[in-house]
């Protein structure tokens, strides 16, 4: 072949190469490997989160129980104060002078103003 024929073949090959887009080689996907330390850290973090959740829920349950007990005690205090007021009113009613004089007459006693002592 002559030099001209070789040049023609080379030119034809270059045109074919120019016309066809170059094929890119597929790059293999590289898996990101998780190291043992990273796995340990992930497990520790998840464990800590679980512990924190359980502790939080436990504390909430404990606070609820304490609030229920406090409400019960407050209710008992209010009830006792009401009972104390009723008893104080009864004491005042029973310690009136007219009632004491009536009981004294019933038992045959006389009230002597010189001999009366105040207890209050």
From Swiss-Prot:
UniProt keyword list: Cell cycle, Cell division, Cell membrane, Membrane, Transmembrane, Transmembrane helix
- GO BP term, example: FtsZ-dependent cytokinesis
Q: Which residues lie on this side of the membrane: Extracellular?
A: 58-120
Q: InterPro entries given for it?
A: Cell_div_FtsL, FtsL/DivIC
Q: In the UniProt record, which is one GO cellular component term? A: cell division site
User: What's the protein's topology in the membrane?
Assistant: Single-pass type II membrane protein
| Cytoplasmic side of membrane | 1-36
Keyword Transmembrane helix annotated? yes
What's one Pfam family here?
Answer: DivIC
Where does the UniProt entry say this protein principally localizes? Answer: membrane
Q: Where are the transmembrane segments?
A: 37-57
Q: What role does it play? A: Essential cell division protein.
| Protein name as it appears in the record | Cell division protein FtsL
Q: Which organism is it from?
A: Bacillus cereus (strain ATCC 14579 / DSM 31 / CCUG 7414 / JCM 2152 / NBRC 15305 / NCIMB 9373 / NCTC 2599 / NRRL B-3711)
Organism lineage reads as: Bacteria, Bacillati, Bacillota, Bacilli, Bacillales
* Designated gene of the protein: ftsL
């Amino acid at each position: 072949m002559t030099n001209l024929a070789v040049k023609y073949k080379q030119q034809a090959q270059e045109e074919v190469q120019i016309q066809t887009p170059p094929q890119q080689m597929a790059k293999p996907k590289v898996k990101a490997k998780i190291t043992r330390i990273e796995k340990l850290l992930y497990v520790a973090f998840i464990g800590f989160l679980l512990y924190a959740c359980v502790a939080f829920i436990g504390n909430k349950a404990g606070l609820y129980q304490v609030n229920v007990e406090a409400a019960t005690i407050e209710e008992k205090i209010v009830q006792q104060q009401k009972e104390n007021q009723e008893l104080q009113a009864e004491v005042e009613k029973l310690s009136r002078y007219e009632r004491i004089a009536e009981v004294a007459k019933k038992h045959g006693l006389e009230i002597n103003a010189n001999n009366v002592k105040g207890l209050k």
